[in-house]
Amino acid sequence: MRIVVCDDEPLARERLVRIVKESGHEVVAQAKTGIEAIIAVKSEQPDIILLDIRMPEMDGVECAQELATLSHPPAIIFVTAYDHYAIAALKANAIGYLLKPANKDELLEALKKATNLNAAQLNEIRKLEDPTARPVREHIVARTHR
């Protein structure tokens, strides 16, 4: 999976990058702010973004809301020191919310969940884009024999 890591704390960002790389995923970009993260996502089109919440310029929740407007948004996993943003994160369509320092196993489980989710989404998109696919009949009405 292609991953963007966004955290304004260099040590936290480096730790996440190391765990991601050790797990066999590719870090395609690193960002220090929400604005940098949006730019990175638009240019790199990652599958997943690991996103801090409290950052300068634009916080992670605002960034996630902006990313959700993209035609192919990445799966969002928040990695933050603040647990009181969990509801806002879920409203921003996050699929994961981990507290710092992120436990390696929890992070890997969140990445696995995001990978599975993205695979399912890709299959649905391919079905929709397949010109040979039969049209879906959503409202079929039929008589029953009694």
Question: Language-model features: where?
Answer:
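Active-site beta3 strand of CheY-like receiver
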Residues: 44-50
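Conserved binding/recognition cores within well-folded domains
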Residues: 112, 116-146
